[in-house]
Amino acid sequence: MSKKRVHEIAKELKGHGIELDNKEVVTELAGLGYDVKSHSSSLDDDQATAAVQKILDKRKPKQAAAPVTAKGFVVRRKVGPPTGSGVYDASQEPSQAASDVSSPPSEPVHEASGAEAAASERVPEAAAVQEPVAEAPRAAASEPAAEAPKATAPVAPEPTVEAPKAAAPVAPEPTVEAPKTEAPVAAAPIAEAPTPPARTEVPVTSGRRAASCRGAAPLPCSGKDPLALNSSPQSSAAFCPDARNPGDCDFPSTSGRWHAWPSRGSSGRFAHGAGRPSGWTFARWTSGRPRAASRRTAVQRPSGRAGAGASHGLQRRKGFGAGAQASGQPQNVTMVGGIPHAPTAPDARALRPTATQAVVISRPLIQVRRVTPTTSSAKQYPMAPGKKAIGEVREFKVVPDHAGRGRELVDVSKNKDKSPRKRGGPNDTSISKQELTDLAWGRVNIPLRGKKKKPTKKGAKTQITQMAEDKKVIKLQEGISVSDLGQRMGVRTSDIIKKLMGLGKMATANQMVDADTVELIASDYGWKVDRVGFEVEDYLPEVVARPEDARTRPPVVTVMGHVDHGKTSLLDAIRAANVASGEAGGITQHIGAYSVTTARGDITFLDTPGHEAFTSMRARGANVTDIVILVVAADDGVMPQTIEAIKHAKAAEVPIVVALNKMDVPGANPDRVKKDLANHELVPEEWGGETIMVPVSAKQKMGIDLLLENVVLQAEVLELTSNPSRPAVGAIIEGELDRGRGPVATVLVQEGTLRVGDAVVTGTDYGRVRAMNNSRGESVKEVLPGYCAEVIGLSGVPSAGDTINVVADEKAAKQIAEHRGMKERQSELSKVSRETLDQLFAKTKAGGGPKELRVVIKADVQGSAEAVKQAVQKLTTHKVKVEVIDTGVGAITESDVMRAAASKGVVLGFNVKPESGAESAAKAEGVMLRSFSIIYELIDGVRSSMEELLEPIRTERKLGRAEVRNTFNVPKLGTIAGAAVLDGVIKRGAFVRLMRENKQLFAGKMASLRRFKDDVKEVAQGFECGIGIENFNDLKAGDIIEAYEIEETRQSLT
């Protein structure tokens, strides 16, 4: 069963005339005993109907007034008299006319109905007051010149809105006979009735002047005359005595019919030359809903019929025309606008309209203007019915304007080929769009209701202008993406990518482009590039070089050579120290800086590692040094790292001093070494060259003084000077993370003096110098040019090879470091890794690409971490790729383990050990931790891990064959084959293959091997045994059992 909510019941009550809001309806329903709490509560239909009826009985709503069917304005038209009728002369027999018009019926056929009686009771008494009729009616009866006016409506066009004829059943009408002249009309109540108020000027709604009727002789009316129903001051309109004809008067229209009756004291005469009686009152034209069919308006047809329709209407409503028609008076009197007119001769003045008729038309929602089609357009639409009558069918769509107030009609019709009609274009045979709009809608503009739209000025047309040349400037910092560059210049991104392709650069829309490339592209479009980026030089102190400030500084000497050629041992001999004995594996894996005092002055030595993995270290040492000592073993000769050191020294353009070490070894051959060095453009002085070669022995400390003397001599030739008074500038030789001291940087000061408390910046790290230690471990307050020290106080471990600068304050240092970090991030984001054809081929061949070994590298110093990273990346092959996830300095921490676990990688430590928390985390996450102290072992361990990722190669090796002679069924074991070994050997647990009639029947694993109820490991050729096979019992005599085993071998990385 459906339900109704409380708010729906409230709407239903509102339709019955009871205005209650939702809360009041809830209160009413609760008082009636219904369980409702809010407007959303619901009741069943039968309960809701009963509740509505109870509330209606309780409230007893007033009967709603009948709705008005036609709310409109009045359009009045002037209508002339009927054809053939003249101007009625009121002077001709006025008494007779008055008597005929106002004679009451004397012998009605039946009494008036109750409805009529009730209606007459509601009429004000003033409307029924009449004067006693004297001799005027009898005299009027004898006048032959005047006829009783016909009971017809005024001759005028039919009103556009008529009262419905079938609105109510027709009540019986009284039949009125002609009045008897000898029967005077006299009634006692009439004489006692009070005199109605004098009718004064009433304003006319049409705006015309108001008028009042002149006093005249009274026109007697019947006491039951329904014409008096509308004689109250509220329903009467105005008196118009001053108008020349009836058409000059305007009457407001509120009801729906014209009613006329003689006013009190009027004589009923029609003045000659006037268009209306002077003593008549005209009521309004009523357009309300008829209460009965008897209230239909009588209309005078143009045909001149004094039809029953006209007379019948007047008889029912007014009782006016019936008496006149039944009196036997002449029928040539014409009623015009409810006024009797006598036929007279035609007059020129009579051609003017003599009556006014109100036509009620429906009020449209908006005012419209009917547009008459032009002659050319009207010809295209014939009036004949049919499909061809309207010509081509067009569809129009109403489209609102941007403000949502106006409307526009858009032609959306289609041609015969179902395609949209083209907009625009000349067409001689078709009419304009505006004419079609007017014809289709009959209106030009459809404004919305409400506030009037203010007239707007028509905007100027958009003009395309060119940007001034001085404004075509792109302010650029470091780089810009391709899409941003196109947006700034107003060029499509695809066009810029084409330009980049023309320059040989493949870039995407989000890829960063450097400033130089931007200048090339912008110049093609007429733009200029203004570099307004962050400049580090603006934050660095300006230094004016003055010769008088220069001071001599000690030379910086780098010892380079192949591994195990005695570089560190030579430095130990120079420093009188024993560093080599403490190195792991007897090799140097760090770059060391030492300051040595000799008889000829101070010398700063840099010890570089000789292993191939430390190429970058050697390169950095060559770049910051003044002189290179190339150590070559006399018994070993020139080796690969020796050649590499020569290249680094030549690239740095520094002089080379060759030390022929190990001269005390029996197999030393210095001449062969000199010959090999001459092949690399290092010709000794005794051979006519410029290279100094000194034979030395580090263990025997032979030739050390001669070597130092040549180094100092070379430094004097170079004339090494610097300005110690300027802000310090140096180079980072090495960086490490000390557990107690934090980030530590080994700094070689090149210019100025570095002091404790200076704000420094290096790379992306910055800080303030808190402490410094020299090469001997002593704390110092300042470091002069040409010396090195360990600096503590940086924000992070610096990268080896970076430049360190002293700035004004720590804020400036931070800004420089952040700017450099941003540039690095942009550079990383702009990198696009593209696969080569070989890589794609290898990925396809390997079925999805090569395997990947992900590693996290931790080392004791920054240089070693970088060297390990480069060495590991060089191990990448087409089968296994090594990807370094992260590189750091310091002990292995728990975060390193979690990072490796997230990427399913391993952690490699070089000269560091894991913390206790890192070991437990590695066991929990299943991450492998591997620590190394020698670079050789680390590389071998990484290579082994790479091979483990590859699938092993499985090969099959035959063991022997056995023939089934008999079968036995053993409980819990199944079928056992009694077999004899034909060749080879049968081993327990081997894989077996069962052959029957030279076809493989089954392949599986051997379950058991016995000989005389004893389990044996193997059975040799010529012996018998019992063989059981897993999950197979279908054994028959004559079957062959082949035993074999599978060997796995590790794949090679190449």
Curated annotation (Swiss-Prot):
<dbReference type="InterPro" id="IPR027417">
    <property type="entry name" value="P-loop_NTPase"/>
</dbReference>
<feature type="region of interest" description="G2">
    <location>
        <begin position="586"/>
        <end position="590"/>
    </location>
</feature>
<feature type="domain" description="tr-type G">
    <location>
        <begin position="552"/>
        <end position="721"/>
    </location>
</feature>
<dbReference type="InterPro" id="IPR015760">
    <property type="entry name" value="TIF_IF2"/>
</dbReference>
<dbReference type="GO" id="GO:0003924">
    <property type="term" value="F:GTPase activity"/>
</dbReference>
<keyword id="KW-0396">Initiation factor</keyword>
<keyword id="KW-0547">Nucleotide-binding</keyword>
<dbReference type="InterPro" id="IPR044145">
    <property type="entry name" value="IF2_II"/>
</dbReference>
<comment type="function">
    <text>One of the essential components for the initiation of protein synthesis. Protects formylmethionyl-tRNA from spontaneous hydrolysis and promotes its binding to the 30S ribosomal subunits. Also involved in the hydrolysis of GTP during the formation of the 70S ribosomal complex.</text>
</comment>
<dbReference type="Pfam" id="PF22042">
    <property type="entry name" value="EF-G_D2"/>
</dbReference>
<feature type="region of interest" description="G5">
    <location>
        <begin position="697"/>
        <end position="699"/>
    </location>
</feature>
<dbReference type="InterPro" id="IPR036925">
    <property type="entry name" value="TIF_IF2_dom3_sf"/>
</dbReference>
<keyword id="KW-0963">Cytoplasm</keyword>
<keyword id="KW-0342">GTP-binding</keyword>
<feature type="region of interest" description="G3">
    <location>
        <begin position="607"/>
        <end position="610"/>
    </location>
</feature>
<dbReference type="GO" id="GO:0005525">
    <property type="term" value="F:GTP binding"/>
</dbReference>
<feature type="region of interest" description="G4">
    <location>
        <begin position="661"/>
        <end position="664"/>
    </location>
</feature>
<feature type="region of interest" description="Disordered">
    <location>
        <begin position="57"/>
        <end position="213"/>
    </location>
</feature>
<feature type="region of interest" description="Disordered">
    <location>
        <begin position="287"/>
        <end position="315"/>
    </location>
</feature>
<feature type="compositionally biased region" description="Basic and acidic residues">
    <location>
        <begin position="401"/>
        <end position="418"/>
    </location>
</feature>
<keyword id="KW-0648">Protein biosynthesis</keyword>
<feature type="region of interest" description="Disordered">
    <location>
        <begin position="401"/>
        <end position="436"/>
    </location>
</feature>
<feature type="binding site">
    <location>
        <begin position="607"/>
        <end position="611"/>
    </location>
    <ligand>
        <name>GTP</name>
    </ligand>
</feature>
<dbReference type="InterPro" id="IPR000795">
    <property type="entry name" value="T_Tr_GTP-bd_dom"/>
</dbReference>
<feature type="compositionally biased region" description="Low complexity">
    <location>
        <begin position="111"/>
        <end position="213"/>
    </location>
</feature>
<protein>
    <recommendedName>
        <fullName>Translation initiation factor IF-2</fullName>
    </recommendedName>
</protein>
<dbReference type="Pfam" id="PF04760">
    <property type="entry name" value="IF2_N"/>
</dbReference>
<dbReference type="InterPro" id="IPR023115">
    <property type="entry name" value="TIF_IF2_dom3"/>
</dbReference>
<dbReference type="InterPro" id="IPR005225">
    <property type="entry name" value="Small_GTP-bd"/>
</dbReference>
<feature type="binding site">
    <location>
        <begin position="661"/>
        <end position="664"/>
    </location>
    <ligand>
        <name>GTP</name>
    </ligand>
</feature>
<dbReference type="Pfam" id="PF00009">
    <property type="entry name" value="GTP_EFTU"/>
</dbReference>
<dbReference type="InterPro" id="IPR053905">
    <property type="entry name" value="EF-G-like_DII"/>
</dbReference>
<dbReference type="GO" id="GO:0005829">
    <property type="term" value="C:cytosol"/>
</dbReference>
<dbReference type="GO" id="GO:0003743">
    <property type="term" value="F:translation initiation factor activity"/>
</dbReference>
<feature type="compositionally biased region" description="Polar residues">
    <location>
        <begin position="92"/>
        <end position="104"/>
    </location>
</feature>
<feature type="region of interest" description="Disordered">
    <location>
        <begin position="225"/>
        <end position="248"/>
    </location>
</feature>
<dbReference type="InterPro" id="IPR009000">
    <property type="entry name" value="Transl_B-barrel_sf"/>
</dbReference>
<dbReference type="InterPro" id="IPR000178">
    <property type="entry name" value="TF_IF2_bacterial-like"/>
</dbReference>
<dbReference type="Pfam" id="PF11987">
    <property type="entry name" value="IF-2"/>
</dbReference>
<feature type="region of interest" description="G1">
    <location>
        <begin position="561"/>
        <end position="568"/>
    </location>
</feature>
<comment type="similarity">
    <text>Belongs to the TRAFAC class translation factor GTPase superfamily. Classic translation factor GTPase family. IF-2 subfamily.</text>
</comment>
<dbReference type="InterPro" id="IPR004161">
    <property type="entry name" value="EFTu-like_2"/>
</dbReference>
